[in-house]
Each structure stands twice: as C-alpha cells, then as structure tokens.
Amino acid sequence: MPSLNDSVKLPCGLVLPNRLAKAAMAEMLGGFQNIPTPALINVYDQWAKGGWGAVLTGNVQVDVNHLGTPFDPSLSGEYIDAETNKDLFEQYRKYAEVSQAHGTPAIVQLCHPGRQSPRGAGRKGLLGSTMAPSAIPLDMGAGFVQRWLSWLVFPPPREMTQGDIETVTRQFVDAARLMADAGFSGIELHGAHGYLIDQFLNPKSNTRTDAYGGSAANRAKFVLDIIAQTRAVVPSTFCIGIKFNSADHHSSSFEDTMTQIGLLVDAGIDFIEISGGSYEDPKMFNSGLQQAEKSARTAAREAFFLEFSAAVRERYPTLILMLTGGFRSRAGADYALSQNACDLVGIGRPAAIDPHFPKLLLDESVQESEAELHLNRIPVPFWAKWIPLAAIGAGAESTYYTGQIQRIAKGLKTIVPL
C-alpha cells in the first residue's frame, strides 16, 4: 500500500515529495488591484513551510473583467512578461519564489468564472454581462425568491461567439506561459464547481450546436484546445493538471464524463483532481462536516468523491488522481490510498486552520488517534435561514475559512470552529 510519505512523479517529470496536496481555496487577498499582494505572499510563505507535497493556489482569474470575487488575483487578459509589465511580472515571480522556497512545488489554479461572475466582480462593472457557452442563467432554485436573488447577484450570461472562445483560450494559454516564466511548477485548470470550463463540459449549461457543443467530445474541445496550445508554449517539465467535477454512477452523464476524462488522458494531462459541486449544487462547499471516528467505515466517509475516483482509476489505471473533499485525518487519507482510489490527497480547510498540517499527518511518531483535526459546522447566520438558497449556508462555510486564511496573512492565530 502507498504511504502518505511516498513521493509521486507526474508524467511531465515533476516530483512531489509526498502525497498531501494543499488544495485550492479562495484567499480573497488580491486587493483592489487584483494582484499578488504582500498579504497573499505571507500566506504562501506559511504553506511553503508546511511540509506539503504540493501547494495549489487559489483562483488566479485569466481576465480581470470577469472575476469570481472582487478580490481575486487576476491578469489583464493580455500576455505579459518581464519586458511588457515588469512590476506585475515581478509580483508573480516573488509569489512563485516564496511559495516554493522550502522545496514544495507550487501549482497555480487558473480560472474563468463564466456565468458565475457576480455583479461588480471585475471591470465589467455592475451592469456588464457575463459570458457562457450558452445563454442559460444560473438555476439556484425554482421559487420566485431564488430566481430573483440569482438574477440580483449573477447577471444573465450572453452566449460566447467563436471570437470570444478564441480570446478566452488565448487568455488561459498566456496565463500559463506567465506562470511558467515566473517560476511556478505548473498550473491547474479549474474545470469544476460550475466555472467556465465546467460550463462547456456540462450539457446542462452547454446547448451549443457547433464544434463546442453536442457530444461529450465536442463539449471538451474548449479545454482540450487550451491544453494543446499551452503545451506548445511551456517547458515539457511544466505541469498541467485539471480540477474536474465528479459524476453519479447512476446518472446519464456518467459515461459522458468518463469519455471526457479519456480525452484529457489522451491530451497528456499530468493529473486530474476529483472534486464536485457548483453554485447550483453546492455540495463541495459544504464539505468537511463529518467528524472522523476511528473506524475504516468512517475514514472512508471523509472522502466525499471516493467512489467516483475509484471508478476513474479502474477505467484509467495510469492516470494520476488527486482526491479532494472532506479529509481531516491520517486515517481518512490512508484509507483513500489503500483503496487505490487516488495518488494524491487534497486537503483544504484544515490547511486554513493549520498551514503545517502535513507535519502532523506525516509524523509516524504521532498516534493515529492524534493525527487529525476536527472541524465543526459553521453556524448559518440567523438571517440566512429565511433565504431559501442552499448556497447561503455553503457561503457561510467558505467565508469562515477565507477569514482564517486572512488571519494567517496577518500573522494571527487561527480559530478552530468548535
């Protein structure tokens, strides 16, 4: 059975020193200029010292006009390097240097939110439109209140033109090239949680009838083009991974999902991170609510997407898989590895409480009963209970842990939810 302490070599040749990856989380530390601020770099200085096998950053948006939050780090949408924008390039170079100062590879999560860009987030302004594969607004519930609140927060998207698709593809490629030039070890394309790449992959949000819609393969064309064009401009040793939503075994989309994963494998993807959820179905954002007991059965429940990951492993045995969502203990992480369901264990919220969490899990002198971190549910604000949106409760969870990340940035002690 693999050990958490074992190294992992990705197809590109990048070696991760152990199997614990700090998963991407929203830091909201890009400031009003949406750049890698000193506060953001302070946080990654702590994670760099934490003993992780890999550190995945929070979202870096590829177009400052379309952000997931008003404070996401982002790029202008145009290619930059040390000559075209020396100051911004230097900020990303410093970000990479600090994040990897202690030998842990840092991988940047690149994202475009598509229709999940709230009003006022990005330079599109309050009245600017979002874009999506098809002009289908977010469906956050059938009731009048849900529909009104959804419209209030997320403007209805316009369908992307061929020119839009080519522009956004180039923005992803240019962003990846910048990260390689700045010294990061790789990128992860955010293809989950309802963001733009996921919107193309999903038939519910992509009803196009051109080369980017219809079949599972056509719906994957957008991300496959990004991968192919990125490979052409970055070193062969630069990692390209993707975060990918799980699918229910019994759903009609399961085989389509497996087909798309196969296309990603054929494209030479270095790893796939299995995750899940979106603003319409925020199960991922409610992760971390189970408490680990000392049984294998409970340890298995720590991994929310274990069954799907195991199915992917069976279909594509050589694919490097990262499983994220719910891990709180060594027992849970060991169980996932023992089931051959993943190669890497992604840990999010515990990293926002204890940036050095791997040191506890990897220290074999620490008893298994002590190698864990209990995190209780964050209470939903009383006013939110009157709003019939599942995303409200999920937002309370995410906001709490973003706040803990910001405490780390200030050098303050984090607060464990009890």
Predicted regions mapped to residue ranges:
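Flavin-dependent oxidoreductase catalytic cores
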Residues: 1-418
